[in-house]
């Protein structure tokens, strides 16, 4: 009898809890235009313009995708910081033609941070958050 009562009450409790994905999906839709503009940009530094948006999405993200957002954001923040520490404008940096006043230590630090951005873990995490937006929210992060 208790089992029957629990089963009957479960839909009531589930209905009151709301959809934990809804807030995240709202955030995805809210930020979609900004991410679309950044994705379409030919400016190499435009990606750093997405970081505040990525932070917002990370904050809204359900637990099952939050770690992937962290894996995307952390290397980008590190690269952004290394570039700033070395006085390098992200939009103008080219590994094959670094600024003349950039010392070897700075160049190596930038290259190490850039490798992390392009690392398999980062790329896999980005693919996961993109797929999650499609699967759960029914829309891509950018169009």
Roles of regions detected by a PLM:
Residues 31-88:
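Alpha-helical segments in soluble extracytoplasmic regions
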Residues 1-14:
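Sec-dependent bacterial lipoprotein signal peptides
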Residues 22-25, 29:
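Juxtamembrane membrane-water interface segments immediately C-terminal to a transmembrane helix
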Residues 15-20, 138:
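Bacterial signal peptide processing site
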Residues 30-40, 46, 93-143:
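C-terminal amphipathic alpha-helix
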């Amino acid at each position: 009898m208790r089992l029957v009562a629990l089963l009957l009450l479960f839909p009531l409790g589930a209905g009151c809890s709301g959809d934990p994905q809804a807030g995240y999906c709202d955030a995805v839709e809210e930020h979609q235009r900004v991410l679309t503009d950044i994705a379409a940009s030919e400016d190499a530094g435009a990606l750093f313009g997405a970081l505040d948006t990525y932070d917002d999405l990370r904050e809204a993200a359900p637990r099952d995708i939050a770690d992937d957002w962290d894996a995307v954001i952390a290397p980008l923040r590190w690269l952004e910081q290394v570039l700033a520490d070395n006085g390098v404008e992200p939009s103008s940096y080219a590994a094959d033609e670094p600024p003349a006043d950039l010392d070897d230590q700075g160049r190596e630090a930038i290259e190490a941070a850039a490798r992390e951005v392009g690392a398999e873990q980062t790329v896999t995490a980005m693919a996961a958050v993109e797929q999650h937006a499609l699967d759960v929210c029914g829309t891509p992060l950018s169009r």
